[in-house]
Amino acid sequence: MLRTYQPKKRHAKKEHGFRKRMSTSNGRKVLRRRRLKGRKVLSA
């Protein structure tokens, strides 16, 4: 049986990367929350 998660670095970056987050207002809210929380890594 085929496993459901077939990781690809490019796809992860395209979907959850910093530039994708910055491109929408809600994405920027995500980054803001993660900064306030003190996350070392903000995005993929």
UniProtKB/Swiss-Prot annotation:
Any one Gene Ontology BP term: translation
Residue ranges crossing the lipid bilayer per the database entry: none
Keywords, in A-Z order: Ribonucleoprotein, Ribosomal protein
Gene Ontology molecular-function annotations: structural constituent of ribosome
Name of the featured protein: Large ribosomal subunit protein bL34
Membership in a protein family: Belongs to the bacterial ribosomal protein bL34 family.
Ranges annotated as biased composition (Basic residues): 1-22, 29-44
Domain of life assignment: Bacteria
InterPro entries: Ribosomal_bL34
Lineage per the UniProt record: Bacteria, Bacillati, Bacillota, Clostridia, Eubacteriales
One GO cellular component term: ribosome
NCBIfam families according to UniProt: rpmH_bact
Matching Pfam families: Ribosomal_L34
Region (Disordered): 1-44
